[in-house]
Amino acid sequence: MTELSKYRNIGIFAHVDAGKTTTTERILKLTGKIHKIGEVHDGESTTDFMVQEAERGITIQSAAVSCFWKDHRFNVIDTPGHVDFTVEVYRSLKVLDGGIAVFCGSGGVEPQSETNWRYANESEVARIIFVNKLDRMGADFLRVVKQTKDVLAANPLVMVLPIGIEDEFCGVVDLLTRKAYVWDDSGIPENFEVKDVPANMVDLVEEYREMLIETAVEQDDDLLEAYMEGEEPSIEDLKRCIRKGTRTMAFFPTFCGSAFKNKGMQLVLDAVVDYLPAPDEVDPQPLTDEEGNETGEYAIVSADESLKALAFKIMDDRFGALTFVRIYAGRLKKGDTILNSATGKTERIGRMCEMYANDRIEIESAEAGDIIAIVGMKNVQTGHTLCDVKHPCTLEAMVFPEPVISIAVAPKDKGGSEKMAIAIGKMIAEDPSFRVETDEDSGETILKGMGELHLDIKVDILKRTYGVELIVGEPQVAYRETITAMVEDQYTHKKQSGGSGQFGKIEYIIRPGEPNSGFVFKSSVVGGSVPKEFWPAVEKGFASMMNTGTIAGFPVLDVEFELTDGAYHAVDSSAIAFEIAAKAAFRQSIAKAKPQLLEPIMKVDVFSPDDNVGDVIGDLNRRRGMIKDQVAGITGVRVKADVPLSEMFGYIGSLRTMTSGRGQFSMEFSHYSPCPNSVADKVVEQVKERKAAEAKK
């Protein structure tokens, strides 16, 4: 087994098309894991192994790959850059100790790279920066370095400088060693020479080397003092300082190269070894109670502790069901019986594998620091904790965003319903941001997801992987309802039909709640007019109705219910009677509280070439967008806006038309906002028409 200090669990993340997957391919080639390099544009890359990924040239699932470099074991996760698949980024950041943030040398800090950077900051994942594609037209390393400061508020620590640019790019100067690494044009990564710094770069190299040293020695007071007195620190001392500053995210070591042309990659791999943390150098994962509150205990990263592992991904592939697991503490051996603390059930570990994209090598055991796949686990879902039967525990839960878009689907073949249900069940286990519901009125199957592309891919997987062809309805927006006025009201539930009856009277106030508060229940009852034992029934009854509002049947948000008084009968009152009273109170009073329809607002980030900015902004305004910011770059303008989701369907096609294919955009859910009356009326009418059409079927 590899020593814990020599593990590196890293993710590679960036904007769509910045070169993440190609970077991963080069890492695998250099570490000897693959012999022929797969190219993304050929549909042959190792980590993009789904048919949909190969065809679209984007990464959808986080593929996990193990490899070795200089006696260190890398567990590498290649994450998607498209915003519809950010759940994969969330998921992988949870189990990573460090990362490589890839930026395009010409595109710079693009919309999705900003989102991923924010997620990585929130997860406190140490990173190095790799500015890729320096062989591209318009590439400018130092411009991208400046963008990371200006746009991401990052502190990039320049470690190398490029030799040549665009077509002339041939290598890099290592600022620490003052050595130039120059590659030939064969595309073979090992074909390079180590030379002296080119004469025309000496002054620039010394300038940036001095900045590097000044930043690094701030991590060590003694070194800083010695440096101020004119003593130059050794390379080993500098590396130690850079490692410390990287781990605390004081700065981000920044490299450059061309993954596609195989130039500069070795220095990035060396940086992973030298600067990114081992599993026992990051803050340990907190343990929680059943409600998700931290207990004050932690999963100490050590093979000698009791087992604590997190199932972070479920996949169904040609080999069967795979559960990807990060082991935080303890050991796991083939044949062990472990506890799933979420279900309370035990499972016996059959086969365990070290993953290499869509291939695998079976292993007998694994321990703290490992990322592995377990074959054939039955009752495990993403986010479940796997632990020692004698030492139950729960790791901090994974939180996933709520879906904002839905489509109705039905199998083309009438006998395909069961096949579809089984397939969708497997897909939900794999992707927690993908949901399914059955419409109570129509009986239709409703698929919910994070965006058009997300659901498009799911329909494609159902067809190709599971052989289920679907009839797909128009995308539907996840509207919500709320109230805008306070109502003081009462309701009495009374039923007598011989024998003991049912009785429950409640007096209450409903009022608008705080934003994002959901449903809040309070009781100010005094004197026992409604005994305390019935309060939970009142809360349960009212809360159960929050899924169906009175305007158009959408879920209701942000309502506060206060139970103020009431009455009960010693014989006829029961929990069920008060629950029924609360349900009726909802129907009676929500309609009086001036209900309002809410629509999801998306945070939209658009890149437009300079000559199309006017068209792009005009189009966003027509879509009821509110422009928040415009940031000028070298190659175009970033426009940030809040836009209703209902106005964004088909936007990618419009943007491509307006910008001749050069525009890009990302969007993510921001908040719910009141619908204008004209929009609300239209939505209500559409719901009525849909229900009328369903009633005729």
From Swiss-Prot:
One GO BP annotation is:
ribosome disassembly
| Protein biosynthesis among keywords | yes
* Sites where the protein binds GTP: 14-21, 78-82, 132-135
Q: Which GO terms describe its cellular component?
A: cytoplasm
Question: Where does the protein end up?
Answer: Cytoplasm
GO MF, one annotated term: translation elongation factor activity
Which residue intervals define the domain tr-type G in the entry? 5-280
Q: Does the keyword Aminoacyl-tRNA synthetase apply?
A: no
| Keywords, comma-separated and alphabetical | Cytoplasm, Elongation factor, GTP-binding, Nucleotide-binding, Protein biosynthesis
Show the SMART domains listed in the entry. Answer: EFG_C (SM00838), EFG_IV (SM00889)
One of its Pfam families is GTP_EFTU_D2
The UniProt entry, under InterPro entries, shows: EFG_II, EFG_III, EFG_III/V, EFG_IV, EFG_V, EFG_V-like, EFTu-like_2, G_TR_CS
Function recorded in the entry: Catalyzes the GTP-dependent ribosomal translocation step during translation elongation. During this step, the ribosome changes from the pre-translocational (PRE) to the post-translocational (POST) state as the newly formed A-site-bound peptidyl-tRNA and P-site-bound deacylated tRNA move to the P and E sites, respectively. Catalyzes the coordinated movement of the two tRNA molecules, the mRNA and conformational changes in the ribosome.
Q: Which HAMAP family match?
A: EF_G_EF_2_B
Q: Which family does it belong to?
A: Belongs to the TRAFAC class translation factor GTPase superfamily. Classic translation factor GTPase family. EF-G/EF-2 subfamily.
Q: Identify the PANTHER family for this entry.
A: ELONGATION FACTOR G 1, TRANSLATION ELONGATION FACTOR G-RELATED
The protein, known as: Elongation factor G 2
Q: Which gene encodes it?
A: fusB
